Amino acid sequence: MSFVSRCLAAAAIAALVILAGCAAPGVHAPERRPEDVRAEIVRLLPNGAKDREGWAADIASAFDVLDIDESTSNLCAALAVIGQESNFVADPAVPGLGRIARAEIDRRAEQHHVPGFVVAAALTVHSSNGKSYGDRIAAVRTERELSLVYEDLIARVPLGRQLFSDANPVHTGGPMQVSVAFAEDHAREHAYPYPVDASVRREVFTRRGGIYFGVAHLLAYPADYDRMIYRFADYNAGFYASRNAAFQSALAIASGRRLALDGDLIAYDDGSAPGATELAVRSLSRELKVSDPEIRRALEKGESAGFEQTDVYQRVFARAQKMAHRKLRRALIPEIALKSPKITRKLTTEWFARRVDQRYAECLARAGAGVH
């Protein structure tokens, strides 16, 4: 392929990504037959994905029960996240997970001033399957396996309850690495469509459950984004984090204060003291003609679409755009460093979003000439 041809091909894919990203997940095209949706997913799956029919069935089912438009753009968005998070392995292995888990136990023991010999003795106790907890933890390869060990440890050993306060420290799992807390909250508000194996937590680690909750987290909320990459950033950083980061950028212009563009509009520690973003808005209360309580109420809508309708949001952008003499972007990828015992190098939300966006572009390219 010539240089010119390569440039034209790259430009075509870029245009396809932009056009696809403009589609709103909740806007439905004419209804498609389920078998047609499954067939398209099979075609869109990357080379090397095993059990293509099974993946297609679970993905199509999630879109159906969540009532999300099965557009090529939306399907590719889900496939891109699955590819990035698990490479289409329902219960992906985590390198060195046993070592990571033992280090976390030791860290928590130190926090609670529990001597090391007490921890070592507790881990020699035989678990429900006859093996010691220490042996089971050393042998775990996946988060599902580790979650089950922690469930057992918390239920049967007093030290487990002391260290983990009845809260399983495995927070994400499954093929889309979705948050267990999000899944449990979602299941309380919406009927889970499949039979539950003991708990919603365990469903997260299944292919069908992980896809269902992951697709809900990615696409089942309204967001006025012009590119899908901002949903990928939100998937990593939280609902509307990209919109909120753009608001913080506008607020920095309007207030003259330096702000972290992390998408967090209020302080999430104990929630009582105002954070930097709230203080910056308060500094403009006279100019914006809003009171401190009004500011707080507006910022508390930061995880909903309704924040955009508040006086705070609209007046901050109006002031910032007047000062900047230009129209400001309404979405920015949040500037967040990713932290987890599983992460061994410097990663950010931007790194995640761009990696997923590249997979999304590749999926759209596989789709061919058009986006349904």
Predicted regions: what they are:
Residues 8-12:
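Sec-dependent signal peptide hydrophobic core
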